[in-house]
């Protein structure tokens, strides 16, 4: 049996990842595939937390740019993450994997409120915990929520699931000579002005010495390879 390199992980999953090739909303086939990948890692004995974005339904920054009050737009974005979290939890149910949703905004009739001790207990008992509503505060991204929850849960790594298979020296879509960084330190990433997470999230991970791995969620088996400690994605470390 494969031995995981990490006992507890915090996976940052963007809302856009749930769209697949659609222009909006939730693509059930894509969700089922992502859930199957997470379930495979969970069966290795890895404790999994997931922070989900909401950009496939509503983006607070975009709403604010169109003239909406920024705080209102951000709260709407948080509610979008709750919808995504519920869709993920239902997909886990269908895959016969126990999962719980905890929301930083209280919606007690629908999902659990975020309670740190309860979340840790769920993870210790093998349940996947999906953290919704970001940090519960406007002006903070779901990247920051992933760094925060990762720190609170004592995760050993934050995994940022993206559309590209790591951090590159340049945009690989524009520059065919772009090279993927296999490993890079926090200080090197800052010095080279690499966009790994947003600045607040990045600073929190750096201060907590919480490593980050940026990888492609659309590459089959990539999540498992990251968890096994193989050369997948880009590892950002202290």
Curated annotation (Swiss-Prot):
It catalyses: UMP + ATP = UDP + ADP. ATP binds at residues 12-15, 55, 59, 162, 168, 171. Coiled coil: none annotated. Its EC number is 2.7.4.22. Inhibited by UTP. It is an enzyme of class 2 (transferase). Pathway: Pyrimidine metabolism; CTP biosynthesis via de novo pathway; UDP from UMP (UMPK route): step 1/1. Keywords: ATP-binding, Cytoplasm, Kinase, Nucleotide-binding, Pyrimidine biosynthesis, Transferase. Its main location: cytoplasm. NCBIfam families: pyrH_bact (TIGR02075). Belongs to the UMP kinase family. This is Uridylate kinase. It comes from Aromatoleum aromaticum (strain DSM 19018 / LMG 30748 / EbN1) (Azoarcus sp. (strain EbN1)).
């Amino acid at each position: 049996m494969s031995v995981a390199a990490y006992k507890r992980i915090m996976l940052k999953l963007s809302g856009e990842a749930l769209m697949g090739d659609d222009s909006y909303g939730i693509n059930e086939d894509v969700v089922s595939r992502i859930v199957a990948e997470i379930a495979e890692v969970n069966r290795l004995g890895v404790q999994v937390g997931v922070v989900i974005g909401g950009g496939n339904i509503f983006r607070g920054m975009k709403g604010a740019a169109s003239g909406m009050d920024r705080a209102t737009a951000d709260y709407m974005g948080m509610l979008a993450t709750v919808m995504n979290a519920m869709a993920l939890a239902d997909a886990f149910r269908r895959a016969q994997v126990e999962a719980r949703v905890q929301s930083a905004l209280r919606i007690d009739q629908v999902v659990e409120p975020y309670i740190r001790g309860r979340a840790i207990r769920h993870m210790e008992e093998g349940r996947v915990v999906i953290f919704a509503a970001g940090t519960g505060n406007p002006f903070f991204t779901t990247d920051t929520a992933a760094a925060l929850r990762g720190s609170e849960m004592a995760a050993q790594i934050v995994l940022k699931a993206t559309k590209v298979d790591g951090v590159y020296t340049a945009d690989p879509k524009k520059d065919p000579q772009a090279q993927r960084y296999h490993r890079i330190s926090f200080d090197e990433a800052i010095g080279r002005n690499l966009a790994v997470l947003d600045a607040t999230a990045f600073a929190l991970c750096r201060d907590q010495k919480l490593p980050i791995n940026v990888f492609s969620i659309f590459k089959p088996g990539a999540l498992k390879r990251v968890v096994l400690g193989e050369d997948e994605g880009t590892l950002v470390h202290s």
